[in-house]
């Protein structure tokens, strides 16, 4: 998979998911490359892909005839009371955002940026909001009587896929303190994020850091040690 630099600083990218995937997947597309495709048959090999995550967002748009950001707002954020969570930079109060720090950010006046394939990592939120989503996952897709995922979807998020020893559907297992936890980490220019939980005790942790070179493993271990003693 080839890396594309389509970041838009200080604004939301004008390119839609439809335009992005036509440019990447169609042989006539501006960003088409055979390197973006696997030679393996579908459902035979697991290979992590950020573009694959964005493709799920595009599929949601095609099925629902609603943009992915609006679909999430109506079906996840509002039902769960996630009032500080947005895909779009234009809808986000900049004064409430932490400043991202990275040597790879070229424009210090507009350090916040977006990208066309935003479903794979363009969400802006806070720990309190995201904890509501995590609690819903822990509680089989439901929080305070509101169901955002089916139990079968949550089961798939906990189940190893295609022979992998770590990768499930979107989530994966990571070892801390010699113990496996389920969740997802993330990183962009100027940010490092971690969200994991113990599938046996249902203890979960979330950490945000406004530095893209942060090693948070020790903090993760300390938080799990604390949480599991409560």
Where are these regions (language model features)?
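Short, surface-exposed loop or secondary-structure junction motifs
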Residues: 1-189, 193
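Short, intrinsically disordered/low-complexity patches at protein termini
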Residues: 92-96, 155-156, 205-207, 216, ...
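Short, gly/Ser/Thr-rich active-site loops of penicillin-recognizing serine hydrolases
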Residues: 177, 211-230
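Short, well-ordered beta-strand elements
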Residues: 183-184, 192-211
